[in-house]
């Protein structure tokens, strides 16, 4: 009788604890994974929650959130965000190397550049053509009208290869007129005797100017070498290096 009474009392207690229809958790949200329709289910039904495989949230593989492999967000490989594989490619690219402009190339071939194929000759800087009077009105007018056809740069070798100014100027005039004549003749333009006479005068003045410029630079370089090779200067430089290193 005692056992029957305990069993009956337990059955009545369970009946009182059963939820009534229409209350909480009846058809609403169930956890985990109950089969009632609707509501948010976890796992793995499609819904909207944090970390779900098919929903829309943070870190989901198919939803729309941050870092998702198929959704739309920042850094996704298939979505439409920054750096994503799909859509427009907003990937970073290495900056293209700057192209060398003609201005920089011209600067590299400035005054003092060794000219290939001329046996060590260098091409001087462009100069203004000197105003020269030839002694008669016809030649003066002819020069003013044709001076643009004459060289404005000279070819020369280093001044230390010549014993005096005359040798430098003579060689400078010959090679400059020869090169200018050959180049101009190749273009279909010929020079008359008057042109050659005027070119010789013009180029001679330019070669003298080039010699003076190169001589001054040469002596300045020599003075600098003598200054830095003197024992007191060497001792001073060594002392400064010792102070810096020490």
Curated annotation (Swiss-Prot):
Start and stop residues of the Sequence repeats: 44-52, 53-60, 61-68, 69-76, 77-84
SMART domains reported in the protein's UniProt record: PRP
Gene Ontology molecular-function annotations: copper ion binding
Binding residues annotated for Cu(2+) 3, in chain numbering: 70-72
Span list, region Interaction with GRB2, ERI3 and SYN1: 16-223
Primary location: membrane
Region called Disordered, residue ranges: 18-102
Localization (cell): Cell membrane; Golgi apparatus
Protein keywords: Amyloid, Cell membrane, Copper, Disulfide bond, Glycoprotein, Golgi apparatus, GPI-anchor, Lipoprotein, Membrane, Metal-binding, Prion, Repeat, Signal, Zinc
Residue positions binding Cu(2+) 2: 62-64
A family per Pfam: Prion_bPrPp
Disulphide bonds in the chain: 172-207
CC terms in the record's Gene Ontology section: Golgi apparatus; plasma membrane; side of membrane
Membrane-topology descriptor: Lipid-anchor; GPI-anchor
Positions of the propeptide segment: 224-246
Biased composition range(s): Basic residues: 91-102
PANTHER family (alphabetical): DOPPEL PRION, MAJOR PRION PROTEIN
Disorder named in the UniProt entry: PrP is found in high quantity in the brain of humans and animals infected with the degenerative neurological diseases kuru, Creutzfeldt-Jakob disease (CJD), Gerstmann-Straussler syndrome (GSS), scrapie, bovine spongiform encephalopathy (BSE), transmissible mink encephalopathy (TME), etc.
Name by which UniProt lists this protein: Major prion protein
Gene: PRNP
């Amino acid at each position: 009788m005692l056992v029957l009474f305990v069993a009956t009392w337990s059955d009545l207690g369970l009946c009182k604890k059963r939820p009534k229809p229409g209350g909480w958790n009846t058809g609403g949200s169930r956890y985990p994974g109950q089969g009632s329709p609707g509501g948010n289910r976890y796992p793995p039904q499609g819904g909207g929650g944090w970390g779900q495989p098919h929903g829309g949230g943070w870190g989901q593989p198919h939803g729309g959130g941050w870092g998702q492999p198929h959704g739309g967000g920042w850094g996704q490989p298939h979505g439409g965000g920054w750096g994503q594989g799909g859509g427009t490619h907003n990937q970073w690219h290495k900056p293209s190397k700057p192209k060398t402009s003609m201005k920089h190339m011209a600067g590299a071939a400035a005054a003092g550049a060794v000219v290939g194929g001329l046996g060590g000759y260098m091409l001087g800087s462009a100069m203004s053509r000197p105003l020269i009077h030839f002694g008669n009105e016809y030649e003066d007018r002819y020069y003013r009208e044709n001076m643009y056809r004459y060289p404005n740069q000279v070819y020369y070798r280093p001044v230390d290869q010549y014993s005096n100014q005359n040798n430098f100027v003579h060689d400078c005039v010959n090679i400059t007129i020869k090169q200018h004549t050959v180049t101009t003749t190749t273009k279909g333009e010929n020079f008359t005797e008057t042109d050659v006479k005027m070119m010789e005068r013009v180029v001679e003045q330019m070669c003298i100017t080039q010699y003076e410029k190169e001589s001054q630079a040469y002596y300045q370089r020599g003075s600098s070498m003598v200054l830095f090779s003197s024992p007191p200067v060497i001792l001073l430089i060594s002392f400064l290096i010792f102070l810096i290193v020490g």
